[in-house]
Amino acid sequence: MTTFATEMVPPADNAEGSRPVAGQPRAFSPGELAFLIGVPLLSAILLLFHPGGEGDEIYLDARDNVTRFLVVHIGMMVFIPLMAVVVYLLLRGVEGTAASVGRIALVPFVVFYSAWEVLQGIGVGILVNELNGLPQAEPALREDLVQDFAEHVLIGPFGVFGSIGSMGLIVAAIAAGVALYRHAGAPVAVPVLLAISGLLITVHPPPYGPTGLALFIVTVLLYVRSQSRNRATAPLGQPRSA
């Protein structure tokens, strides 16, 4: 009876672009929802304090903001794994290839993006602080040392660690969006916004990072709302999640 009723439901998009599915993932508890929203929100607030600059004069940008520079990047060491947990939780109960790809992609994101943050953020901050304590050092020498370190092939803007870590997050975001749309009845806005947010978050200084995290929060709310609506309108005979 369940199979027959499920097959009778056409796999067409509804008015909001979401697709009916045979079963819905378990609803998030209030605590889980607070975690899904709170982590990106606090991360966005932290990134608002990220020192500015174009990246071509890193010593000059950071020399008077060393404490803030270090606090932001040490904080990011906490939020990187927490964001991975957020995406993993968002995919709870969702099956399919896209969901598996999204979960696997979180591993290189956490490993390599964290390594990049340690060196590019904390390492640069410590180096700038030490150079500030050497008044005999020529200003040009300080600038060159910091710039050369920050542009090293492993940790530069398009270096090995940052590139692999960023690609991990982007792939995880895109795959998660596809999985939620195809297998969890999410509206089409969810994969679109997740892809955009992943791209913006990897360019983490403001306004990009905070904007991407804000879009991520909007995506979570859209998905949760669609899940509530899908459960409320599920036809008789279609299995509901407990």
Annotated model-derived regions:
Residues 1-2, 11:
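Cleavable N-terminal export/targeting peptides
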